[in-house]
From Swiss-Prot:
Organism, scientific name: Maridesulfovibrio salexigens (strain ATCC 14822 / DSM 2638 / NCIMB 8403 / VKM B-1763) (Desulfovibrio salexigens)
Gene Ontology terms describing biological process: translation
UniProt keyword list: Ribonucleoprotein, Ribosomal protein, RNA-binding, rRNA-binding
UniProt superkingdom: Bacteria
Region called Disordered, residue ranges: 12-52
GO cellular component entries: cytosolic large ribosomal subunit
Subunit architecture: Part of the 50S ribosomal subunit.
Protein's UniProt name: Large ribosomal subunit protein uL15
Family: Belongs to the universal ribosomal protein uL15 family.
GO molecular function, one term: structural constituent of ribosome
Physiological role: Binds to the 23S rRNA.
Pfam family, one: Ribosomal_L27A
Biased composition (Gly residues): 21-32
Length: 148
């Protein structure tokens, strides 16, 4: 037995449709493209968004809103996630968070308050939610907010 003899058998494989090979095949002559017109030409046809000349949907609907170029997006990390990744540590810097792969390097980090803080710990991040700050300080630690 050779590789080319293994399943699927030749009879089970569907032959591709060969067009333009005589009228007896059922796909001769115009090869299923009809007579003349844009769709009969090579490379012919209209793009998927073309609506036949009527005013396109994107132009019928009004413009709305804008994109703020100065928007800052923060990666949200819960206190529980951070402490779970750094068990036994008392100081967790932003660089540590990046190195551990909790978020991409250079991302703005906001710490949220879901999870338990049992020991005093110092955490560095760009922002802290009120609940996160409360939990960290209640356990005797500090929430160090960075600039930028």
């Amino acid at each position: 037995m050779r590789l080319h003899e293994i399943y699927p058998f030749q009879e089970e494989r569907k032959n591709r449709k060969r067009v333009g090979r005589g009228g007896g095949s059922g796909w001769g002559g115009t090869s299923g493209k009809g007579h003349k017109g844009q769709n009969a030409r090579s490379g012919g046809g209209v793009p998927a968004w073309f609506e036949g000349g009527q005013m396109p949907l994107a132009r019928r609907l009004p413009k709305r809103g804008f994109k703020n170029p100065f928007r800052e997006e923060y990666v949200a990390l819960n206190v529980g996630q951070i402490l779970g990744a750094f068990e036994g540590r008392t100081e967790i810097s932003l660089e540590d968070i990046y190195e551990r792969g909790l978020c991409k390097k250079g991302a703005l980090v906001k710490v949220l308050g879901m999870g338990e803080v049992s020991a005093a710990v110092t955490i560095e991040a760009h922002r802290f939610s009120a609940s996160a700050t409360e939990k960290i300080t209640k356990a005797g630690g500090t929430a160090k907010a960075l600039e930028g």
